[in-house]
Amino acid sequence: MGKITFYEDRGFQGRHYECSSDCPNLQPYFSRCNSIRVDSGCWMLYERPNYQGHQYFLRRGDYPDYQQWLGFSDSIRSCCLIPQTSSHRLRLYEREDHKGLMVELSEDCSCIQDRFHLSEVRSVHVLEGCWVLYEMPNYLGRQYLLRPQEYRRYHDWGAMDAKAGSLRRVVDLY
């Protein structure tokens, strides 16, 4: 079970809302979100209701302002608790529909380009565990939650282009 608390103001001030499960619409509980405390679990936050818009991956910890979670604004409108698994494995493909060069990962990768010489990823097959794909190296830029399934093209995971800089397994480190 997870627990996350959203605060309207920076530094854990102002009106707040505590959540322990997926919530497709947070709008009734707060108008803006400027700080977050994650007490347990790993969470994906979304800037719009129904798990749409920019995504932000948060692990246990304190985030005193939205820049701490690489947020573009103070808009958080939905969230989901990411299930934990003991093993992680996925395949990246250079072309759509799982074609072209394929590489398999079971560990975090801070720079896909340096490690595999892939500047773009056009399809993904997540075999085990949940992952976060970042558009830039070193876990920066836009973030995309990848669950166990086949993603035949980058639009399937919500991306506007095939940029893929780094990958991180969803693991609660505590």
Swiss-Prot record:
GO terms for biological process: lens development in camera-type eye; visual perception. The keyword Isomerase does not apply. Residues 2-40, 41-83, 88-128, 129-171 form the Beta/gamma crystallin 'Greek key' domain. The modification S-methylcysteine is found at residue 23. Pfam families: Crystall (PF00030). PROSITE patterns: CRYSTALLIN_BETA_GAMMA. Keywords: Eye lens protein, Methylation, Repeat. One of its GO terms (molecular function) is structural constituent of eye lens. Residues 84-87 are annotated as: Connecting peptide. Has a two-domain beta-structure, folded into four very similar Greek key motifs. Crystallins are the dominant structural components of the vertebrate eye lens. Monomer. This is Gamma-crystallin C.
